[in-house]
Amino acid sequence: QQQTLAGLDTLNVLCIDNDAPYVYQKDGEPAGMLIAILDDFAERTELNLSYTFCEDRTQAREYLTNGSYDMRIGAPLTSGTCAELGFINSAPVIQSVLAYVQNPTSSGSGTIAVMSGIEELINTEGYDNTLIFDNTNECIQAVESKKADLAAGDRSVMEYYIYDNGSTLVTSLIPGQTQNVSIAVSRETDATLLAVLNNYIYSISEADLAGYLSRGNLHSDSFSLLLFTRRHPAQAILSKIVVMAVLALVNFLPANRAAKQRVAMQEQHNTQLKEALQIAREA
């Protein structure tokens, strides 16, 4: 792979922010599943990466018009839109399920919010109005403010921002609807890059993929615990009591086992001593 990409040195990667757990910024640094995969890919191929972040798809088009980028990640593109922008999608990193997000206090179903770029994946025929937003977080906020009755998009992304916002929205799967999460590679970049990248993606095991996704979700993992505590204080207190009891039991069992071992050893020693004294008397 290093020899194949010998003509390349630095890859310029355009990242669309607010697409956690796949692509986002954490404390000003690139983060997310796709970032982690590209970092490891660059390390293996001895390439350098230069990440540039933009806010949404609209701004991404401006960046692509005014600059040159080898890759584009975040807010996955369908093959048609990808080709229109002069890119080719890599092999799917993962296939993510699509879902609805709904406010449990809302009884309406006339307006649906959808992220720009995936409209063709969502059947909106049964709704009176369709609102198009630049990112998933804006779709969620539209449902929270009741501008929309529900939103549709990538389940992992929506659940990340539901946790992140401390929201009470609920998700439900859209049966049979999925989207590929891929890395878009520019047609102007050396064609061998796409082939080598695809080979690398195919080589990633299911366990490693789960690890990459987990790294992308680190922010929401701690928040989900906070969210559970906030929403269910009584259960949280009970859970804490149970955990403390389990820890006490775990600490007690080894100590109790060690004490029993000491008693057994002492009894064995006493038995051996009695036998030795008995032998001495008989002699």
Regions found by a protein language model. Give the residues of each.
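Extended ligand-binding regions for polar small-molecule ligands
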Residues: Q1, G32-R44, S106-E120, T124, ...
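Extracytoplasmic small-molecule ligand-binding "clamshell" domains
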Residues: Q1-G80, L121-I122, D128-F133, Q141
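Extracytoplasmic/periplasmic, Sec-exported soluble proteins
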Residues: K26-M33, T52, D56, P92, ...
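Acidic, polar ligand-binding/catalytic clefts
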Residues: I35, D39, E43-R44, S50-S109, ...
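Sec-exported extracytoplasmic/periplasmic mature domains
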Residues: A42-L47, T65, Y69, E144-A148, ...
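Membrane-proximal low-complexity regions enriched in glycine and acidic/polar residues
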Residues: A91-P104, G108-Q177, I183
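Alpha-helical transmembrane signal-anchor helices
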Residues: L225-L273
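Conserved HAMP-HisKA connector
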Residues: Q278-A283
